[in-house]
A protein has these predicted regions:
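Polytopic transmembrane helical bundles with strong interfacial aromatic enrichment
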Residues: 1-134
Length: 134
C-alpha cells in the first residue's frame, strides 16, 4: 500500500480517537465541575484542539503529497512519518506538560510540543519543495 493511501487512513482513524477524547473530556469536565484548575483546562483543550486540527490538515497534506509532487515512494514514506510524528508530538506535548509541568515553567511537555512544531515545519517545507520542483 502506498504511503499516500495508508497515512490518510491512519489520520482518519486517529480522528476517531480525538473525537472520543473530546467526548470523554466533556464528560470529565461536566462531572467534575470545579475540580480542574485553569491550567489543567487550558492544556486539555490545547492538546485536544491541536490534535484534531492538525490531523484534518494532514489529510490535505497527503492529497498534495500524492498528486502534486513527483517524490519517490520512499520520500513520501519519510515525509508522512515526519508529519504524523510531528502532529503526535505537538499535541501530545500539551498532555505531557499537563501531567508533569508547572504553571509558568518549561517541562518535557513543552519541549515535546516545540519538537513537534519543528517536525511539522520540516514536513511542510519538504512538501513545498516537492510542489515547486514539479
Amino acid at each position: 500500500m502506498e504511503p499516500t493511501k495508508l497515512y490518510p487512513i491512519v489520520a482518519v482513524l486517529s480522528l476517531v480517537t480525538v473525537e472520543y477524547g473530546g467526548w470523554a473530556l466533556l464528560s470529565f469536565v461536566s462531572a467534575r465541575r470545579g475540580q480542574l484548575d485553569d491550567f489543567q483546562t487550558q492544556f486539555f483543550r490545547a492538546g485536544h484542539a491541536h490534535a484534531g486540527v492538525l490531523l484534518v490538515l494532514s489529510l490535505v497534506y497527503f492529497l498534495y503529497l500524492g498528486s502534486k509532487t513527483d517524490f519517490a515512494e520512499s520520500t513520501q514514506w519519510i515525509a508522512g512519518a515526519i508529519l504524523l510524528t510531528g502532529v503526535l508530538a505537538q499535541s501530545g506535548g500539551f498532555f505531557l506538560h499537563l501531567a508533569v509541568g508547572e504553571v509558568g515553567r518549561g517541562s518535557p511537555g513543552t519541549r515535546l510540543t516545540r519538537s513537534g512544531a519543528l517536525l511539522i515545519a520540516t514536513a511542510l517545507v519538504l512538501l513545498a519543495v516537492g510542489i515547486a520542483r514539479t
